[in-house]
UniProtKB/Swiss-Prot annotation:
GO BP of this protein: translation
Superkingdom, taxonomy of origin: Bacteria
Keyword Ribosomal protein: yes
Designated name of the protein: Large ribosomal subunit protein bL28
A GO cellular component entry from the record: ribonucleoprotein complex
Lineage: Bacteria, Pseudomonadati, Thermodesulfobacteriota, Desulfovibrionia, Desulfovibrionales
Family that this chain belongs to: Belongs to the bacterial ribosomal protein bL28 family.
GO MF, one annotated term: structural constituent of ribosome
Amino acid sequence: MSKQCDVCGKKAQVGHHVSHSNIKTKRRFEPNLQSVRHQYPNGEVKTLSVCTRCLRSGAVVKPAVRKVA
């Protein structure tokens, strides 16, 4: 599973750890991805890796929850 949002395409960025003595070492900033079940307009349901920004903006439609009898 790649560290990339399936909706907006957001992926890891490169930056630095900066120590007290100002020594810089490489690091990665990973997006906050969540696994979410998404329902397409034709009724198909798939699991997507979605960043929290897309979740909050409503870019993903969650399927209706069925009640178990």
